[in-house]
Amino acid sequence: MFMLLVFGALLPEVPLSGQDKAPPQADGISATPLFNYASLRLPEEHIPFFLHNNRHIATVCRKDSHCPYKKYLENLKYCWGYEKSCRPEFRFGYPVCTYVDMGWTDTLESAQEIFWKQADFGYAAERLEELHVLCQPKEKNDSSLVCSRYLQYCRATNIYLDLRNIKRNHDRFKEDFVQSGEIGGYCKLDIRSLMSQGQRKSPLQSWFAELQSYTELNFRPVEDAQCDIVIEKPTYFMKLDAGVNMYHHFCDFINLYITQHVNNSFSTDVYVVMWDTSSYGYGDLFSDTWKAFTDYDVIHLKTYDAKRVCFKEAIFSLLPRMRYGLFYNTPLISGCQNTGLFRAFSQHVLHRLNITQEGPKGGKIRVTILARSTEYRKILNQNELVNALKTVSTFEVQIVDYKYKELGFLDQLRITHNTDIFIGMHGAGLTHLLFLPDWAAVFELYNCGDERCYLDLARLRGVHYITWRRQNKVFPQDKGHHPTLGEHPKFTNYSFDVEEFMYLVLQAADYVLQHPKWPFKKKHDEL
């Protein structure tokens, strides 16, 4: 019974706010909607999948003349893929594999399944399957703790956190920050199971260091008035990677999005608490992205120092550098691409940040070159390459430098999402490929010997990837000057053969024009 009690809370229902407040009209039809459908803030394509997992809202919609989603009610079979009842043909998407990586498997079908579990909604399915109760409520509404393997994701109710005696220093992820009795709940703790989950104890891979001190308390924190502050809203705890690097920081955001799926809740009426044991602030160049996940400013843990804080509902988010996690530490099977998970993430963020597709206009292929104002990896003959591109009448060419002080992140996203061919040197700025339209191509002009990084990210997102092929057609300024390693290809600048460059860009353009989602069907004879 207690197991059912705990797991029943894992997939919370979206509250039917206003359901009892709508006054009926004389003809029996409610004058106002029975549910605030606008509060879902989901892309239209995601609505049937949301209704599949929230049948109570589907039921209300069926009864509500104001519901805008009635067209989806006749078929609620569409599912993300991690639901136990989900049939493969109704999944949000399924990877495409073009060849078999014999180091992993021997058939295309099994390759698809491997890739789906590695990097698609199958990854969320595996986290859901791992969930087990570590602290069982003694009675209804008592505390609980449920976690996936290695404590990579946890969900707690009525959790107590005592920060009256903590000591902060320069360490952002101090492992002994909280002691026994300073974190816990009123529930029956399976201490043996808890302590067996420490194999991947590491700051950005697990919550084990933070939760190994979880204590079975002899008091009910909230009911017994043991809290200086009670947080009523659901709260996501996160340990964040580098906020000044888009590649690393978006590992935070994609894992928060996966966590929302595991939690079956996409509400923005939640708090995000940055678990940071230092006294430092956090530099975040991409802070606008939080608007896709929360209505409030991110809270630093130190905000609660010297207090006993109780959280009615706490979620410990999946982390950015987990072993076999997404997407920093992911060994991927070759030959496969296009995950529904990363496409859904892109759609979700763009929708909530109000980034729209404005073209292409007049059949032009929009080519964006990402320039660098940093010391290294500059394109030395950039003007020559741009002039060559401008000789193609169907190209609309622009050069951008995504310097945060001059161009805000939302403006950067608008440019990226309205680009058909995105060109740039190896670097974190290429993470923008996550927000290209589905038909787009990304051209990593030179990967500087790091062959997998953005190739794999493009495969995850499902956009076409090309990079420089012929070493005798690229000309480094020198051998590179790494501050400690000496010669290094990432620490110099490059010139490129114009003819080879145009050959590769025209290949990318051909891909864009032939993509089934390319919205402009006119023949581009100039190409």
From Swiss-Prot:
Name the Pfam families on file.
Glyco_transf_61
What is one cellular component GO term in this UniProt entry? endoplasmic reticulum lumen
Catalytically driven reaction(s): L-seryl-[protein] + UDP-N-acetyl-alpha-D-glucosamine = 3-O-(N-acetyl-beta-D-glucosaminyl)-L-seryl-[protein] + UDP + H(+); L-threonyl-[protein] + UDP-N-acetyl-alpha-D-glucosamine = 3-O-(N-acetyl-beta-D-glucosaminyl)-L-threonyl-[protein] + UDP + H(+)
InterPro entries attached to this UniProt entry: Glyco_transf_61_cat (IPR049625), Glycosyltransferase_61 (IPR007657)
List the Gene Ontology MF annotations in alphabetical order: protein O-acetylglucosaminyltransferase activity
Query: What does the record give as EC number?
Result: 2.4.1.255
| Main location as per UniProt | endoplasmic reticulum
Signal peptide feature range: 1-17
Which residues carry a glycan?
Answer: 354
As for subcellular location, the record says: Endoplasmic reticulum lumen
Could you mention a single GO BP entry for this protein? protein O-linked glycosylation
Q: Where is this motif: Required for optimal activity?
A: 295-297
Q: What does this protein do?
A: Catalyzes the transfer of a single N-acetylglucosamine from UDP-GlcNAc to a serine or threonine residue in extracellular proteins resulting in their modification with a beta-linked N-acetylglucosamine (O-GlcNAc). Specifically glycosylates the Thr residue located between the fifth and sixth conserved cysteines of folded EGF-like domains.
Q: Per its record, how is this protein called by name? A: EGF domain-specific O-linked N-acetylglucosamine transferase
Q: Which organism is it from?
A: Bos taurus (Bovine)
